[in-house]
Each structure stands twice: as C-alpha cells, then as structure tokens.
C-alpha cells in the first residue's frame, strides 16, 4: 500500500449537516428517552433512525439489558438532525450521550478533535468480540491519525455495478469480470434502447456531497485525479479530474436516465426496479432491495466490481458505526453496548428473530460464511464482500492524499465544498453550462479550503 501523507487538518467545531450515502436505509422519525446525562446502571445512546437501528432498539431491553442489567436510553433522530445534535454534544464534551452513531467520515475528524474515547484497550480485553473478524477496510476507516481505534461498524457498504443479465443476453453483450469505465461506456451505448424506453445506465446527477459526488469521486480517483494533492494543492482543474468529469457527464447525458440532473440513489433505484435502465453503478446496499421477493427484477441481475481505469479497485466505503464520547461517565458500560450491537451474536439474534435479510451486514467476514445469510443473499453477497474488502480508504487513487476517504475528503469542510461542487457539475449534466466552466468555479472553491491547510 502506498504511504499516505496524513497531515493534521485544522480543527473545527461545527460540522455541516451531511447528505446521505445509505439512502435506502432511511425512514421516519422517532424520539426516545434521553436524559441530561446517564447515571447509575444506564447509558444514553443517540442514533440515526435507520430501520436496522430501530430494530436494535426494540431488541435491546429483552436481550442486552436482560443479560447485562444495563438500561439503554435511546434518542433516535433523522440523519441530518442526529448529525447536528451529535456534533453539538460531542464538541462541547457535555457527556449527555455516551454512545452515538457516526460514519467513517466523522470518526477520524472527531478523533482528531479529541471528542472520542479510544477503543483499543476494550478490544484487547474482549476476545469474544473478535476484532480481527471485522473487515480490514472498516477497521482502517475508523482509525484515527494516531493509529488508535475510535469506532466499531454496525453495518457498511461499498459500490459496484449492477446490470440486467437478461437484457445483456438478448443483445449478445458480455460484462467483463473486471470492467473498465471505457468498457462500461461501450456497453451503455449498446444497451441503450434494448427495450422500449430503456436507457443504457443510471448514474447519480442530483446535487449533494453524498449524492452525485460519491460515485463521481470514485471515477475521478480511478482516472488518476484527486481533490487535493499531499501538499493541499487543489486539483479540480487538473487534466485527470477534468477528463473523469467530462466522461461521467457525457455518459449520463448520452446514455443515462431521463432527468439525470435530479436523479439520486432513490431515483436510480426506481429506474432499475422498473426496467428503465440496463445498468446502474451505486451502493452495494441496493442489491438487497433489487433482489427482494416482490421486486420485478429479482433474479434478473448480475453484479460486477466498480469499474476502473488506472487503479486496481474503485469502490467507495461507508459505514454507520458506534463512537463513545470522551466525556462519557460510563465508558465501560458504553463498550459493553457497542460490543453487543456490533458483535457476531447480535447478527445471529437478528437472523433468528427478524430474518437474515435484516442482518446489519457489510462489516464482518463471518457474516459471509454463515449458511443462513449466504442463502438469503446468494445473488450478491460474495460480490459485496469483495467490494468492501478491496476498498482502500487511505489510498484510493494513484497519488498520496492529505486526508483519508474514497468518495469524500476527510475534512469538516467537505460537506459544504462537495455540495457546492456537485451543484456546478449537476448544472453541466442539465446542459446549463460546460464541464470546464463548472470545474473552473469548483477549483476556486477548493482553493479557498486549500489555503486553510497548506503548509500544515
């Protein structure tokens, strides 16, 4: 693995509200009990309202509390709200919440700021947890600049290419075992119009750092581009970044879905489900929805690794994980909860009581050797595991990076920068401006951020 330059970015206390990468896992709001600080034999947990989280909430009292005697007070909020509340409580080190759900975007930043309790000693003293069973890229993405572990994944995802194998067979098309983007563009052109109203591919064009910029940044990486070099020089107007962006914009304009500039994860999911596109590059978590029992495309799909050009792999990495606040007055009890929620036993519990399709997968190697899970996810589980294991959060491109991240740059400012840049590129997808014009503006935005970090 290439040695990465990991300079220490400027500490900021305010975290911008984030977009979503795990769009299929979002649901409505429910707020549970949360006190002004945990005490006695209880802990306070602040978490996002994704379905798998609320399922955990329902199972906690009858299993975790019954086994340990520790009561868990949950506060459950929508994603943007929970991110805001977590950043406020953890930045102030108020200690109101012992545990919170954080992604691999926030955890290294929070660790750098001193807001999180390290988990190394807990892992070492808890052999039953089996930290080595956690997929290596997940462990890497939840490790701080100091090499210490600050989070444990609850579930995770990467990205890959989904395609209609029946349509490909009808058209005499073959998906390469390890496709390049050049090959994918050729296949998209040939599959375009394969059936009435069917387009060749669906790619996100909806503005958002976690919408359009997620897949596009993986394309930039494998084309040889980067947002910033190791010295914090902005490179959005570099030949590689420009080539990748023009490729992406041209592909989606020529052979992509209608209304691409307003299409995010949800819209592409609908297009794929309804047979309106022959291919879709997006989150591995989408496969479970496409292969659901009532899905009209169940059994009709094939899966391939994220397309590449100059790199060996290109898939992104994202996880909802658990972090323990440094100011927690109950870190030992907090670890017991984290160990239970992210442990092998909890996955077995969910599989036995709710169903294996509901298991919070994407984090442990043992999940993918479990016969019950393998049967449930036979169509895509091997490709999903391979995608996650091949993700390189510290070395996603062809050059050293100043901060970790594949589909994002691991600095607090990226949520705002990424969203603004995505708006410019989405306008190019819509035909309102050229890619060159979009990236000229974007370079200026990135240079302002770069000045904050240069020389550090």
Regions found by a protein language model. Give the residues of each.
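Conserved C-terminal helix/tail region of periplasmic/extracytoplasmic solute-binding proteins
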Residues: 2, 71, 169, 392-456
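Extracytoplasmic "Venus flytrap"/periplasmic binding protein-like
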Residues: 63-134, 169-172, 271, 275-279, ...
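A structural signal for short loop-to-beta-strand junctions that line the ligand-binding cleft
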Residues: 88, 96-100, 128-167, 199, ...
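Hinge/lid segment of periplasmic solute-binding proteins
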Residues: 104-158, 212-215, 298-304, 385-392, ...
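Short, solvent-exposed loop/beta-turn-alpha elements that line the ligand-binding surface or hinge
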Residues: 120-134, 177, 201, 205-206, ...
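Extracytoplasmic/periplasmic solute-binding protein
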Residues: 143-154, 159, 182-234, 246, ...
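Glycine-centered hinge/linker elements that transmit conformational signals in sensory
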Residues: 187-190, 231-262, 302, 306
């Amino acid at each position: 693995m290439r040695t990465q330059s990991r300079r220490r970015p400027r500490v900021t206390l305010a975290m911008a509200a984030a977009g979503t990468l795990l769009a299929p896992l979002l649901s409505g709001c429910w707020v549970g009990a949360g006190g002004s600080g945990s005490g006695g034999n209880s802990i306070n947990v602040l978490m996002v309202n994704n379905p798998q989280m609320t399922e955990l909430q329902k199972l906690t009292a009858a299993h975790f509390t019954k086994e340990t005697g520790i009561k868990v007070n949950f506060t459950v909020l929508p994603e943007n709200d929970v991110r805001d509340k977590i950043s406020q409580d953890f930045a102030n080190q108020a200690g109101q919440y012992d545990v919170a759900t954080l992604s691999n975007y926030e955890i290294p930043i929070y660790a750098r700021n001193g807001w999180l309790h390290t988990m190394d000693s807990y892992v070492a003293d808890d052999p039953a947890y089996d930290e080595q069973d956690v997929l290596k890229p997940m462990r890497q993405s939840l490790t701080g600049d100091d090499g210490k572990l600050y989070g444990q994944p609850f579930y995770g995802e990467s990205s890959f290419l989904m395609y209609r194998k029946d349509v490909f067979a009808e058209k005499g098309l073959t998906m390469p075992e390890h496709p390049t983007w050049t090959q994918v563009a050729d296949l998209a052109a040939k599959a375009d119009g394969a059936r009435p109203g069917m387009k060749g591919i669906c790619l996100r064009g909806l503005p958002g750092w976690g919408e359009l910029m997620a897949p596009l940044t993986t394309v930039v990486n494998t084309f040889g581009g980067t947002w910033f070099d190791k010295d914090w020089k902005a490179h959005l107007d570099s030949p590689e970044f420009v080539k990748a962006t023009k490729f992406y914009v041209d592909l989606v304009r020529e052979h992509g879905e209608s209304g691409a500039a307003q299409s995010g994860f949800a819209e592409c999911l609908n297009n794929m489900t309804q047979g309106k596109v022959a291919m879709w590059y997006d989150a591995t978590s989408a496969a479970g929805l496409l292969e659901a029992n009532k899905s009209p495309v169940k059994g009709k799909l094939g899966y391939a690794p994220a397309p590449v050009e100059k790199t060996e792999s290109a898939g992104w990495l994202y996880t909802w994980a658990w972090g323990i606040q440094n100011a927690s007055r109950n870190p030992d009890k907090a670890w017991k909860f984290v160990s239970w929620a992210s442990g092998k036993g909890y996955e077995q519990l969910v599989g036995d009581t709710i169903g294996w399709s509901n298991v919070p997968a994407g984090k442990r190697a043992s999940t993918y050797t479990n016969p019950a899970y393998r049967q449930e996810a036979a169509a895509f589980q091997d490709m999903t595991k391979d995608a996650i294991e091949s993700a390189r959060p510290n070395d996603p491109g062809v050059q050293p990076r100043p901060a970790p991240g594949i589909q994002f740059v691991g600095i607090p400012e990226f949520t705002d920068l990424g969203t603004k840049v995505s708006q410019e590129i989405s306008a190019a997808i819509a035909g309102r401006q050229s890619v060159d014009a979009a990236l000229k503006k974007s370079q200026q935005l990135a240079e302002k951020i770069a000045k904050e970090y240069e020389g550090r």
